[in-house]
């Protein structure tokens, strides 16, 4: 897991956000390295158990996702912290984790193999 501290888009308090960062994995049968997963709509029990330390990362219904996706929420006001602002642009905390400045992203290893469904992100060089 990758974690970073951001300013909440609603209340502006510092809040921790996380994402699944994989050193290695398989996406649609293709081996990938150093990628993140966002827009997670399903996860296995093992990953759900390991997400226990981050209760603000939970399923959230959104208009464009009828069944909801797992997303970060502010620990102070509960506002959703949209994945787009965390993954999609240079300068976002999870845009390029391998090249992030020291101390910006904190990594916590997951135990074993986990399975999830979402959108993978990686930097093309």
For each of these PLM feature ranges, what is it?
Residues 5, 71:
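Residues immediately within or flanking Cys/His clusters that coordinate Zn2+
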Residues 8-11, 74-77:
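Short cysteine-rich clusters marking metal-coordination/redox-active sites
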Residues 11-17, 21:
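Long non-transmembrane domains of secretory-pathway and surface proteins
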Residues 17-18, 80-84:
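Short, non-ligating residues that shape and space the ligands of small metal-coordination modules
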Residues 23-34, 87-100:
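Short cysteine/histidine-rich metal-coordination sites, predominantly Zn2+-binding motifs
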Residues 23-24, 59-69, 89-90:
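Short linker/helix segments within small regulatory modules
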Residues 39-60:
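Short, charged low-complexity linear segments at domain edges
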Residues 99-125:
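Long C-terminal interaction/binding lobes of large macromolecular proteins
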């Amino acid at each position: 897991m990758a974690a970073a501290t951001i300013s909440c888009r609603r209340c502006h308090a510092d809040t921790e956000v996380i994402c699944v960062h994989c050193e290695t994995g398989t996406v649609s049968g293709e081996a990938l390295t150093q990628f993140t997963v966002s827009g997670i709509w399903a996860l296995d029990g093992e990953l759900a158990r390991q997400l226990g330390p981050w209760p603000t990362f939970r399923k959230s219904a959104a208009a464009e996702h009828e069944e909801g996706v797992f997303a970060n929420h502010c620990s102070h006001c509960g506002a959703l912290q949209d994945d787009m602002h965390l993954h999609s642009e240079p300068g976002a905390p999870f845009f390029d984790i391998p090249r992030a400045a020291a101390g910006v992203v904190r990594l916590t290893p997951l135990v074993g193999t986990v399975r999830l469904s979402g959108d993978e992100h990686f930097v093309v060089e």
